[in-house]
Amino acid sequence: MLEGRILAVSSQTKAVSGIPGAPKRVSFAKIREPLEVPGLLDVQTDSFEWLIGAQSWRERAAARGDSAISGGLEDILAELSPIEDFSGSMSLSFSDPRFDEVKASTDECKDKDMTYAAPLFVTAEFINNNTGEIKSQTVFMGDFPMMTDKGTFIINGTERVVVSQLVRSPGVYFDHSVDKGTEKDLHSVKVIPGRGAWLEFDVDKRDTVGVRIDRKRRQPVTVLLKALGWTTEQITERFGFSEILMATLEKDNTAGTDEALLDIYRKLRPGEPPTKESAQTLLENLFFKDKRYDLARVGRYKINKKLGLNLGQPIVASTLTEEDIVATIEYLVRLHAGDTEMTAPGGSAVPVEVDDIDHFGNRRLRTVGELIQNQIRVGLSRMERVVRERMTTQDVEAITPQTLINIRPVVAAIKEFFGTSQLSQFMDQNNPLSGLTHKRRLSALGPGGLSRERAGLEVRDVHPSHYGRMCPIETPEGPNIGLIGSLSVYARVNPFGFIETPYRKVENGQVTDQVDYLTADEEDRHVVAQANSALDANGHFTDDRILVRRKGGEVEFVSSAEIDYMDVSPRQMVSVATAMIPFLEHDDANRALMGANMQRQAVPLVRSEAPLVGTGMELRAAVDAGDVIVTEKTGVVEEVSADYVTVMADDGSRKTYRMRKFARSNQGTCANQRPIVDEGQRVEFGQVLADGPCTENGEMALGKNLLVAIMPWEGHNYEDAIILSQRLVEEDVLTSIHIEEHEIDARDTKLGAEEITRDIPNVSDEVLADLDERGIIRIGAEVRDGDVLVGKVTPKGETELTPEERLLRAIFGEKAREVRDTSLKVPHGETGKVIGIRVFSRDDDDDLPPGVNELVRVYVAQKRKIQDGDKLAGRHGNKGVIGKILPQEDMPFLPDGTPVDIILNTHGVPRRMNIGQILETHLGWIGKTGWNVQIAGDGSRPDWAEQLPEEMLSAPADSNIATPVFDGAKEDELTGLLGSTLPNRDGEVMVASDGKATLFDGRSGEPFPYPVSVGYMYIIKLHHLVDDKIHARSTGPYSMITQQPLGGKAQFGGQRFGEMECWAMQAYGAAYTLQELLTIKSDDVVGRVKVYEAIVKGENIPEPGIPESFKVLLKELQSLCLNVEVLSSDGAAIAMADGDDEDLERAAANLGINLSRNEAATVDDLAN
């Protein structure tokens, strides 16, 4: 029997994927997997360990047999060394990078806005070549950001992720096109280095072979060969077989090497006087010098592989060689001639074919380590320039490595990368799954990658070589579709940056447990069978003809003797988020894409609930995401409280695990951990001690299991609207906690220092009631918009004093300085409870930006119940907005009186073809009620239950079920189990074997005319909450030039009354309504103040004036030198001067309206 664990926990297996103490989940899986899911964060952590040359990485490399490889930092220092001065009399070299301890813990860094980093030291050796004197020193190279064990970086207190980049691998690429005019076949080849100049060869429609160096003008290829020192005889000897190359040679009239060199120089450097020496140096520098040209190990490997050059030897030369160029040309002419095979002198035979640049053999991954390494290379090369200059200016005797080195450019380069690079992103912390997916993301965008505009359809499309490497389903909708992907579950990245996926070896028709990781190139050479091919107990295929796939994704039936490999697992091709969709095989791909993406937008609820119907992936995903706490050593739980768990390990050591309590995530959701173990309980290594957000008993739990009826209801769930029961509001089933951070700082200004104080001018005592003596709000205070969180005053400019005031000052001394209120207030539309305050002050030696004396952060939490307008979704792309919340007594109910929780419309299913949601609903009901399969007297099972594992024949109520992707419950099994569900306590079975029940109308008590599908579906509350979107404004800020209200909630803007809305008003002839919309409600500056005055005084609304936008139009026409005048009805010119300013100022001052743009005048301010 083949060994290997079944996917999820069943009653016999103690654990799933090696995690002890896992909750029980009954699984439908029928295929055994010989391989555990690898660490889901390895793509990040392994790469960073390579960069810093960590011990664990060295051990892994040695186990793989890569003993010669050095770490990323060592590589780059070796590449830089030695730095020589211009005369070559002295040199500086670097070696042995090493790190000190990290300065502060991750929590401290987040709290104090610090970067989680360790000091980097290198050994620098200065050699004076004239005297032979060597000076060696340890040099500090700046603080180097370190990766946390969760694969993230903490930069200035915020958690960030560096996304892996998909780029075209260095190497040679052959291409084929057809000439539009002559319909001739044209072939071309590009030699793409890791860095340096491109070299391109092509055969044009006149059948001549040409070359372009560094994207300059085309020349005959024989010119380049002659420039490399080849004589006409040598060229004829090597390429005599090719007519087109011989024809090119005849047309080329350069005499010898010197003339060819000059010819190339003229094309590359037009306008400079060519000499033989400068031409020779130019060509050398372009392709044959380490400093200027680098193929990288991967480029050398690809070129050797493609052209069949010295394949056996280790990879050494990182520059081009003459043989590379000649072999490339030969390959090109053979490709044009239609040959199928080529053997380079001293090399091995390779097939001659064009390349597909979207193939994963030609696209590689730049992971974190390499991206940082490239950035450090930039910084070091800037530093190298400084070192050279200092070598020439400083006194040779006094020079030490320390005096030569300036680390600023290196530190700046690293800072720039983490702070501003497109690939260093603010981590998505909506829930554990979104964080995990973010770390496994593959992006084709970014520096050195594609841009959205230039990327065509081919790059974005699903390619056969993505299988098992990049998920074909999980990608964003919109402009980035296909450019951003997600790593498949079992994929890993090899040292060259190519993505590998595991396969089981098949020998003579027998499947072994030997697992080989193959790159896309290697996989093309083999015949691969699917994971669900039927096997017998010895691993032999049971069918005569087996469905396999060959190169290019073609499928066919072959005999078992021809098969080389077999898939490791049915979920090999999908990513983690996609692998968490049950019945994925019954969903249309477009909807599955939405389902995978929407799981990442799930908001952590107050109480998490694991899904009744899962896929067996929930536990591993939650544990690897790192938001749950796992035991580091086997032992016994000694003490448990809400804040920490202490474990006494078997070796006598104690470890205290601290919980994160109600912390704010990057997205403003609430990250809270709580223990799930008891005192005295024995815990194994790797067991879950505490749940985080969106987890239950260590399993990912993004939503809730709700009783759903799938039916239309009075048209209230038309167009994907959702009807909910009031119970979900009252019992806080879909309630989430959101935490906002508000920050204010007190700075030094030109007029004096700002001050955080309780003493605010012109403010009533009620407003200050919740502030403490410092002027900061107390913890636990309930606040709503406009309330003061932190009192602050700013000095105002001294005004001209009247003689009376001056006299009073002279008598009574210095009067209190004029200050204005610049307190931190709760933004418009937000409410909540203050749960935390952090005060940083210069006096306490806190690290603050220059000019800032004090910084206060206030955390306000709000509990958001579910309400109309919030967005809910299932896992199958079935999303909708809540249209109505019905009282519990009006909801349809089952025959035993149970009201349903949620009503979804039937019309959302057929056209979208996501039938998975219906199957999930049925299986959810089966799991909730429990089941018992009737076994005949002779022990035989019903036909549908033949395939079921033994422990699946019966289960109690509330059983969690796993139905793995592509290996889940079959339709006949569902029908059979629906007929075997356990009765309720009255002995009745509510739902028939077709999955439908007779529902009764809650309002009338009458049964609905048709049976309705009822069951349990996993429903997720998404981050699109109506509270964050709803917005209203009376008065507020105006745009500087047009004087119209700003737009958008963030700017506290108004609602736009656009062109089409105006047409609607015109159609109804609503002239006066339209006039006030376009003038006094918008940009008639004087009019709107007068209207406000009239409303306050209870007078009639005055006549509208001239809108500001009309004045702007006039000015724009005048700026085009057009003389535009405004005429009144009697033909007299009207002056459009801003003559009304005085009236405006007077009216505004009387009303206390602030007309400056910066501070929004709210109604509350005016009331004060």
UniProtKB/Swiss-Prot annotation:
Stored CDD domains: RNA_pol_B_RPB2
GO BP annotations, alphabetical order: DNA-templated transcription
Top-level EC class as recorded in UniProt: transferase
Entry's Gene Ontology molecular function annotations: DNA binding; DNA-directed RNA polymerase activity; ribonucleoside binding
One GO CC term, this protein: DNA-directed RNA polymerase complex
Keyword Nucleotidyltransferase included in the entry's annotation: yes
Record keywords, A-Z: DNA-directed RNA polymerase, Nucleotidyltransferase, Transcription, Transferase
Paired cysteines (S-S): none
Reaction(s) this enzyme catalyzes, per UniProt: RNA(n) + a ribonucleoside 5'-triphosphate = RNA(n+1) + diphosphate
EC assignment: 2.7.7.6
HAMAP family xrefs: RNApol_bact_RpoB
Function, as annotated: DNA-dependent RNA polymerase catalyzes the transcription of DNA into RNA using the four ribonucleoside triphosphates as substrates.
Similarity annotation: Belongs to the RNA polymerase beta chain family.
Subunit organization: The RNAP catalytic core consists of 2 alpha, 1 beta, 1 beta' and 1 omega subunit. When a sigma factor is associated with the core the holoenzyme is formed, which can initiate transcription.
Official protein name in the record: DNA-directed RNA polymerase subunit beta
Organism expressing this protein natively: Rhodococcus jostii (strain RHA1)
